[in-house]
Every structure is written in C-alpha cells, then in structure tokens.
Amino acid sequence: MDVAVALLARRDYGREQLKSRLLDKGFESPEVEQTLDTLEAKGFIDDQRFAAALLRSHIAKAHGPGKVRQALMQKGLNKQCIEQVLDASDCDWFALARSRALKKFGDSPADGMKEKARRIRHLMGQGFSYDQVAYALEYDPYD
C-alpha cells in the first residue's frame, strides 16, 4: 500500500493505470486489488476525478471530443465514465474547433480544394467531428 500511496503522491492515477503500475513492480494480483479497493474507499483513487482532470488538460490543448475519448480509453477508463465526463463538460466544441482553426491557419480563407482538404484533415485528426470542422472553417460542402 505504501508504494501505491507514493505513486499517488506524485500524480493522479486511474484505477487501471495504478493497477498496471503495481503489477509491473511485482506485486501479486489479489494484494493489488485489495489495495486498490482500500484506496478507492478512502477517496485516493477516483476515476471520475481523474477523467475530469484529463479532459481539462485536453481542452486546454484544443483537442476535440474524439481525441479526448480515445486518450481516456487508453488510460484504462471505462466508456460509461468517459461519456459521463464528456456530457458533464461545459465545453463548446464548436467554438474550440474554431479557435484551433484560427490559431493554426489564421483568418485567411483556404486557397483551393487541396488547402481546404488539408485543413479539414488537420481538425478531424485533432478529434473534431465533421460538423464541428465545417463550422470552424465556415465550410459548406454544397457550395
């Protein structure tokens, strides 16, 4: 338990991440589960809090909901926890996509289809949906 608390003293971990770290250090699985249950009961481990902190970090980096969702899943958080945190978020993803586009490309319009496609690919690669990208670039596909 001391090792787990020492790890948590440095930074926040999700349950699965901490479990992985402890197993890597050579602790037995039943002992790790018991320690994690104790730490969770005492409030040292909270996946919701961990997910919310990661969400804030990704929003600060102007990542879209798709990229945030993928990053949270890689940290070992379950889908229900991820969706709860994303739903509870008061982030305006459309405005975030627009600010990301302005920062990356400036206020100048795209010159030609090749440049438009490059901008769309960039924003979609940052986790924004097509609707959010179209809004950010003021792009009408029927134009």
Regions found by a protein language model. Give the residues of each.
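An alpha-helical, amphipathic repeat domain used for nucleic-acid recognition
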Residues: 1-143
